[in-house]
Amino acid sequence: MTIQMHKKVKITVLRTEYYQELAEQYAISYLGKCPFHQKGQVLYSDGINPPDGMCGVAWQVIAPMARQLSLGEPVQPSGTWLNDDRVGVFACPDGIRPVIFLLEAE
């Protein structure tokens, strides 16, 4: 039986967006940018557990990719759309105030 060691996964917030026109049409009046994450914020995961302070909805989206990276596997077939197999760029599913994350295997 082979035991596979997990790499640490660094999760960096690249951008936080807020689409005012969509918020005005579809959201409550006091909605603003994501309250969980700020540009430049860095979090770490073992690829299995969400880091402290991570938005649960965003984690549900990026967890499969974090797991792959923690196991040393690429998140996409080599050269498909990213130029480095050890990284991934993903967004949370909030269409009004999405957050863009960079995941890196360490």
Where are the predicted features?
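A short, structured loop/turn motif at beta-sheet edges
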Residues: 2-8, 36-39
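Short, compact, well-ordered microdomains
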Residues: 63-106
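Short, charged beta-turn/beta-strand-edge "cap" motif at the junction between a beta-strand
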Residues: 17, 47-53
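Short, conserved turn/kink motifs that form compact alpha/beta structural patches or helix kinks used as
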Residues: 40, 51-70
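Short, flexible N-terminal segments of the mature chain
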Residues: 24-49
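Short N-terminal binding/cap micro-motifs at the start of the first secondary-structure element
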Residues: 18-23
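A short beta-strand micro-motif
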Residues: 8-15
